Amino acid sequence: MCELYSKQDTLALRERHIGPSCKIFFAADPIKIMRAQGQYMFDEKGERYLDCINNVAHVGHCHPEVVKAAAKQMELLNTNSRFLHDNIIEFAKRLTATLPQELSVCYFTNSGSEANDLALRLARQFRGHQDVITLDHAYHGHLSSLIEISPYKFQKGKDVKRETVHVAPAPDTYRGKYREDHEDPSTAYADEVKKIIEEAHSSGRKIAAFIAESMQSCGGQIIPPAGYFQKVAEHIHKAGGVFIADEVQVGFGRVGRYFWSFQMYGEDFVPDIVTMGKPMGNGHPISCVVTTKEIAEAFSSSGMEYFNTYGGNPVSCAVGLAVLDVIEKENLQGNAVRVGTYLMELLSEQKAKHPLIGDIRGVGLFIGIDLVKDREKRTPATAEAQHIIYEMKGKGVLLSADGPHRNVLKIKPPMCFTEDDAKFLVDHLDGILTVLEEAMDSKSGTVFSENTAYRTKMPKEIQVELPNLSATEAREIPRGKRNGVCSDQQALLSKRLKT
């Protein structure tokens, strides 16, 4: 790719022509990316960066099979979804084959936000109820209907929570209301949802849906305790509502053993609606809502046609099919287990070594490192997290920090991430943490405060029962091919490390 402008000119033109609310990574010192391949990105100087946060390029940046599928279909046909063509049917068939039998009807859209917006419409049409229960710190998209149900956004701005929206505590067993030492955190958190339902009913309100990411991403890489979703679904169904599982950031095999993250919680948990996006097209805009026939028929009974000009177009579906093919052919679910297990093992060693690491939680290639100033108090190390991501960038590793305190390092790399990549990441993290902690010790426990000059430069921008698996055992998992969900022999979940 030829560089049109210098980095300085690109920044100046962006400031002039792009809205100021459109933020970029590393705003204090942004990277100008010119090309990417696999798990690597390259700047205008040819410097290589290991991409550990871009879960859009799911099977790897510019994967040749995906590029080929897009170009081939673009040369042949691209049109709107009112014309009959095979790609949309084949894609719907392949997608639903990875899901429980009840989830059999697809609506194709173009982004995760579109998918979640449509999911709300389906839920509200189903029984005519209007209220929605969401989790604290949740983010479900940028549309007005989704900002309303995203505390991650509306709590930071001037928007006021609408009376149709109810916020339940995030099921965080590390720093939430009910922690790992609670006798039954799943029931305690689910009872919070039950309480919200009862209070809504006492005010004459009716619950249309409960919506949650199968694992909270922007909320801090949170994995709910086992049994939580089952209990919540029971309460929601009794209230006449539906359960929406948002898989936009965590689906398509990222957790390893399962194709969809909600499947980690057991066969007795089946959402009524599943939304998907981001990795679905490996960077191409495509998303989908999958639901039951009953809910789809209720939506149709309104008499209003649902039409999305580009949703399910031939090119998008060809790209989506290619992504599914690559996941299967390259056994990327198995890779997520092998590399994820190895990475968690390396990080557990770092946790024992570095007091700044309060908690490590993750499944497959979805991992969060919760940084703290004090392990006992679990005081979020927000400024330190920002320092670390900039230092890691200087070492050629791209990370970001998120969560309500922006102190959780997010690791969500392309699925072709290797063990060598994992070691490269951890080796540099180890070095940076060592230097930082030495500086903190010399200054009585803190280097950066929220008000330091350094801080002002920063961008403002399941727990489940799992087998104990060593990295060696994980690497010995067979690399066999299989359509849909990997078998137990192919993949096992990474375990969540406790404090």
Curated annotation (Swiss-Prot):
**Needed co-factor(s):** pyridoxal 5'-phosphate
Pfam families in alphabetical order: Aminotran_3
Q: Which Gene3D superfamilies match?
A: Aspartate Aminotransferase, domain 1, Type I PLP-dependent aspartate aminotransferase-like (Major domain)
Show the catalytic activity: phosphoethanolamine + H2O = acetaldehyde + NH4(+) + phosphate
Question: InterPro entries in the record, alphabetically?
Answer: Aminotrans_3, Aminotrans_3_PPA_site, PyrdxlP-dep_Trfase, PyrdxlP-dep_Trfase_major, PyrdxlP-dep_Trfase_small
Native organism? Mus musculus
| Keyword line | Lyase, Mitochondrion, Pyridoxal phosphate
Asked if the record carries the keyword Lyase, the reply is yes
Q: Predominant location of this chain?
A: mitochondrion
Location in the cell reads: Mitochondrion
Enzyme Commission code? 4.2.3.2
Name this polypeptide is given:
Ethanolamine-phosphate phospho-lyase
- Could you tell me which residues carry N6-(pyridoxal phosphate)lysine? 278
Q: What does the function comment of this entry state? A: Catalyzes the pyridoxal-phosphate-dependent breakdown of phosphoethanolamine, converting it to ammonia, inorganic phosphate and acetaldehyde.
Gene Ontology cellular-component annotations: membrane; mitochondrion
GO MF assignments: ethanolamine-phosphate phospho-lyase activity; pyridoxal phosphate binding; transaminase activity
Query: Which superkingdom does the taxonomy of this entry point to?
Result: Eukaryota
